[in-house]
Amino acid sequence: MDGLAFSVSVHGHRPVVVRLLGELDLAAAPRLQSALAGLDGDVELDCSGLQFIDAAGLAALLEAQKACAAGGWRLVLVDPGPAVDRLLRLVELDTVLLIRRNGRAS
């Protein structure tokens, strides 16, 4: 898959779920940032379908986390695949971002 597709699900007072599919890269990061900027409340980014992420994508995640924190909300990355999870660990963003793997927060 080229590019990034995402869907946003809002269910009452539960966290907003944003499902990511494809590649979060320089071309896609601004679209994701725009979509997340309009959300209020806790956000779960379902990363199970995210196949690739580059530096611009990582920066977009950090900006989203900062925006959520400024509003008093939480951003949680849910089930990143092996390649994405490995990169998050290598650049030590797993110490900055809240990540839930297979139902467990870390």
Label each region the model flagged:
Residues 1-52, 62-106:
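STAS-like cytosolic regulatory interaction modules
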